[in-house]
Amino acid sequence: MRLRLIAVGSRMPRWVEEGWHEYARRLPPELALELLEIPLHTRSKNADVARLIRQEGEAMLGKVQPGERIVTLEVAGKSWSTEQLAAELERWRLDARTVNLMVGGPEGLAPEVCARSEQRWSLSPLTLPHPLVRILIGEQLYRAWTLLSGHPYHK
């Protein structure tokens, strides 16, 4: 099974890249975790933000192949405990489809992306900085995998 994080934004600080790669490399090859970055369009004072969000959404959906699962990360999504995330991860594994985790830009996800989502996941009711979200997703997926594998990381 492939897990892909499709996120709006690029040129993250080095600590973000290191944190992401640390958790991605810890996962086994049969649970490959990949990051696809969608460039964030420049938001000027007079920018048509709705149009920019639509363009970013189109670019995100352009990375998804027919039949692949889309899971959007949204504040209004469902909060999962570690055990619940582990159960979802196991369901995704058994489903054998690529799972695309979608993280929008500063204004969120395009409505077209949300409409295609099979599941909505909320990391927290708090507004989190996008660089930190990447690391949190990687760590939580790793933690869920260790729980399923009986690894002592999750205690």
UniProtKB/Swiss-Prot annotation:
Subcellular location: Cytoplasm
Keyword field: Cytoplasm, Methyltransferase, rRNA processing, S-adenosyl-L-methionine, Transferase
Keyword Amino-acid biosynthesis: no
One Gene Ontology term, aspect cellular component: cytoplasm
Catalysed reactions, semicolon-separated: pseudouridine(1915) in 23S rRNA + S-adenosyl-L-methionine = N(3)-methylpseudouridine(1915) in 23S rRNA + S-adenosyl-L-homocysteine + H(+)
Record-listed E.C. numbers: 2.1.1.177
Main location: cytoplasm
GO molecular function, one term: rRNA (pseudouridine-N3-)-methyltransferase activity
Keyword flag Oxidoreductase: no
Pfam families (alphabetical): SPOUT_MTase (PF02590)
Amino-acid positions noted as binding S-adenosyl-L-methionine in the UniProt annotation, renumbered to this chain: 73, 104, 123-128
Enzyme class: transferase
Function text: Specifically methylates the pseudouridine at position 1915 (m3Psi1915) in 23S rRNA.
Family to which this protein belongs: Belongs to the RNA methyltransferase RlmH family.
Subunit field text: Homodimer.
Record-given protein name: Ribosomal RNA large subunit methyltransferase H
Gene name of the record: rlmH
